Regions:
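Hydrophobic alpha/beta core scaffold segments
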Residues: 643-647
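Hydrophobic, well-ordered secondary-structure scaffolds
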Residues: 17-18, 484, 649
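N-terminal localization/anchoring segments of enzymes in phospholipid and broader phosphate metabolism
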Residues: 65-618, 636, 640, 652-768
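Glycine/threonine-rich ATP-lid/beta-loop region of ATP-binding domains
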Residues: 628-631, 635
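Compact, charge-rich alpha-helical regulatory domains located at protein termini
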Residues: 1-68
Length: 768
């Protein structure tokens, strides 16, 4: 029985399986769980794991020529020569890995340790994540499949095979979302006097109030379209709420009418809160917009009988396709493309669970979709907008305990930040430490008569950003302000176009980066005249210059007066604005030029050190790992004995736990109150450890199609801090999930141990 790659299946288990008539992976894949439970020493968890892994192996071996596991030596150069590490077997599918991440987010909605309204928020986030999955990843796969593309990813699955694989997984996730809503969240909320009322639950006075609301707030806005040759099926906006209405009777012109479409404008709230006079004291009563429309839609069709109506929502391809080599003005070209996003190719359709088959078939036909792209839902078709109630409910006991982010001494509004940074570099850890010092630095730069220039990159910064206000203020004060605005930040394009225009009108020099490359690095450079010299002050970060997300995402930011580092950043800005070549950088590693090769060399150095018996260890904390060459380098390092710890929030295509290949690699994902967003790289380097922070994940796009910045952390206090933080994340036994060989994740459980939750420890340690 070739089960060597199945974690937990050794020679003894193989012999026992053979005694029970299971001699091959195929037979194990087809085994019934009850059959395995009869085997001594095999519990439910192990049985499920063995069957799942066997099924995966059977599927993979039909697609790729997997090297026989029996021929793989445990370690050494000969092993590397005989193993084809480019085989698809060694890579987890990227799309399936992303769906696994969304499953982990959804699990937070079921975690009883999390406050109830935060659990509701996690449910909504999982829905929003699924929307983006379909708009981008699934849409891209569908497009490639329809074009007949056969080029496989690192896992050797073609677009067609990947689509088939994600179909069942995605349907299961959506079904679980609505099960949690209806069977878990709504009953728990009702027990806390927070109710989402169905039409059958409305009292007489509530119904009167809602009818008046419909007549005054909705009726004048809604515009139903009766379907006939003169009124064809309308264009449906991406992710909009729509109703298909079944009618009987004749319209005002005496014609038979049987179907109509009603689109709910996005300006309308999806949830309406009943006034306090219509609820009992201390209660919160909400009604879905769809319920109100369902109840009173007849008022839109006088003289025609409304037989029924069913909500539906279409998700479309939201990628924008620009031939950047052929356009003269990127901003204007993007403006022209933005409107088309609402009408991209259809990817999926969600319909009410009770929608009849004939109407479903009609809708599928209108959008050119198949049954595989159909998702029946028992509830509102857009769960993500349920989060609107969060701010309407004044129940601190059902939310996370608020905290006050702190600032290191010398960085407050009453201090001269330049003098503070001149004395020492400062590492900020958001959201535990405030983002305010970064904003204050730009403000002081605008007011300081010795500051002559400010250069900054902006990828996402949000509406009404104090960063932007500070830059505008500096420009008005006569400073030379240059801003590299990345117009192509997905789903923020419109905001960034508006931002760029506003900055230009104020006299800021605005550039849009490099054609073909997104500017994703987070860089701020301030040039200050001190005596006869210009001095550099820099800020480099792992996250965006976005004050709102700085309160929700974990990120690091470095404030430094290191002149070599500042000169590196200056050169990068010259490269971005003038398109000219620059000399070799001193300390900064930059994608798409030096970062990928530098990482490969550092991993190879650890591999060599392990073979020489020297201390060798790698810790990588990123959002995603999918770049094949980096994964292969990590495999080779593991085979040489390097201990590798990966803290990867989302996608991870590396397959850990393969005997002789990746058994020295552990992959964990931490999902908690804050979105883990920081990128940190650690290399043991034979006892001379190196730490880096960066804007780049281990993805092909970050290495080759984006401008990224990776910067060293050198001062001992900051090095010690990063070491302690990484150690804490590796000890987390509460919010951490461990990646299994088969691509699934198992949550850590502190059995008999003290609970260690990294984010909570950092909150207690760093905040007020």
């Amino acid at each position: 029985l070739n089960t060597r790659f199945i974690k937990g299946v050794g020679k003894t288990t193989r012999s026992i399986l053979a005694e029970h008539g299971i001699f091959s992976v195929d037979e194990l894949a087809k085994a019934d769980i009850d059959q395995l439970l009869k085997i001594p020493g095999v519990g439910k968890s192990k049985a499920n794991r063995m069957i799942s892994a066997a099924k995966y192996m059977v599927g993979e071996m039909t697609r790729v020529n997997v090297v026989s596991s029996e021929s793989i030596p445990a370690h050494g150069d000969q092993a590397e020569k005989e193993i084809d590490l480019s085989s698809g077997y060694y890579y987890i599918n990227q799309e399936l890995s992303l769906l696994e991440f969304n499953r982990r987010v959804l699990e937070q909605a079921k975690d009883e340790r999390t406050p109830l309204l935060e659990r509701l928020n996690f449910l909504c986030i999982s829905c929003s994540n699924m929307d983006e999955f379909f708009e981008v990843m699934a849409a891209g796969l569908i497009q490639r499949a329809e074009l007949g593309a056969t080029r496989a990813q690192a896992d050797h699955l073609t677009p067609q095979e990947t689509l088939a694989a994600i179909c069942e997984r995605a349907h299961g996730l959506v079904h679980e979302q609505y099960r949690i809503l209806n069977q878990v969240m709504l009953p728990l909320l009702e027990a806390e006097d927070i109710r989402f009322l169905r039409r059958s639950q409305w009292s007489s006075s509530q119904r009167t109030w809602l009818k008046k609301y419909f007549q005054e707030q909705l009726l004048p806005i809604l515009s139903p379209i009766g379907l006939d040759p003169a009124h064809p099926f309308p264009r449906i906006l991406n992710k909009s709420l729509n109703f298909i209405i079944s009618l009987a009777g004749k319209d005002a012109f005496g014609r038979e009418i049987d179907l109509a479409i009603l689109q709910a404008p996005r300006s309308l709230p999806r949830i309406i809160q009943l006034p306090k006079r219509e609820t009992r004291s201390g209660e919160y009563d909400f009604v879905f917009l769809s319920s109100i429309i369902h109840e009173f839609v007849g008022e839109l069709f006088h003289g025609v009988k409304v037989k029924d109506l069913y909500q539906f929502r279409v998700t479309r391809n939201s990628e924008m396709y620009l031939d950047e080599e052929e356009i003269d003005d990127l901003l204007r070209a993007l403006e022209g493309e933005l409107s088309s996003r609402n009408y991209g190719d259809e990817v999926r359709i969600e319909v009410a669970e009770n929608c009849p088959d004939d109407i479903i078939e009609y809708l599928l036909g209108q959008f050119g979709l198949t049954q595989e792209r159909l998702y029946k839902v028992n509830g509102p078709v857009n769960l993500s907008r349920v989060r609107e109630v969060y701010d309407l409910i004044d129940r601190p006991d059902l939310k996370y305990v608020p905290f006050t982010a702190t600032s290191p001494s010398g960085l407050g509004g009453g201090w001269n930040i330049f003098e503070t940074i001149k004395k020492r570099d400062i590492l900020l850890h958001h959201p535990y430490e405030s983002f305010a010092p970064v904003i204050e630095l730009i403000r002081q730069a605008g007011d300081d008569p010795d500051v002559v220039a400010i250069k900054q990159t902006l990828y996402r910064t949000g509406a009404n950003s104090p960063i932007v206000e500070a830059l505008l203020r500096a420009a008005k004060a006569g400073k030379e302000v240059t801003v590299v605005v990345e117009l192509r930040a997905r789903f923020d394009e419109r905001d960034n176009i508006s931002l760029a225009t506003r900055l230009q009108e104020a006299g800021v020099q605005v550039v849009y980066g490099i054609v073909g490359y997104k500017t994703h690095g987070k860089m701020l450079l301030i040039l200050r005249r001190e005596g006869k010299h210009l001095r550099y002050y820099t800020h480099l970060g792992t996250g965006n210059y976005h004050p709102k997300t700085a309160r929700l995402y974990t990120d690091y930011g470095l404030l430094s007066s290191d002149q070599e580092l500042g000169e590196d950043v200056r050169k990068v800005f010259v490269q971005l604005t003038s398109l000219g070549k620059v000399g070799k950088l001193n300390k900064l590693l930059q994608a798409p030029f030096t970062l990928h090769q530098a990482l490969l060399k550092k991993i190879e150095r650890e591999t060599l050190h392990a073979k020489q018996g020297l201390p060798a260890k790698i810790i990588i904390k990123v959002n995603a790992v999918a770049e094949p060459k980096l994964i292969r380098a990590l495999y080779r390092a593991s085979m040489a004995g390097v201990q590798i710890k990966l803290i990867v929030r989302g996608i991870c295509c590396l397959r850990p736990g393969l005997e002789g290949i990746s058994e020295n690699i552990e992959v964990r994902s931490v999902i908690g109150r804050f979105l883990e967003h920081s990128r940190v790289y650690f290399f043991e380097n034979a006892g001379q450890p190196e730490y880096f922070a960066a804007s780049a994940d281990f993805l092909p796009r970050n290495m080759f199609r984006r401008v990224e910045a990776c910067f060293p952390i050198l001062q001992k206090k900051m090095v010690d801090r990063l070491r302690d933080d990484l150690t804490l994340y590796l000890k987390d036994n509460s919010q951490a999930w461990i990646l299994q060989t088969d691509g699934t994740y198992v949550r850590t459980h502190p059995e008999g141990q003290s609970i260690i939750e990294a984010q909570s420890v950092l909150l207690e340690k760093l905040t007020g």
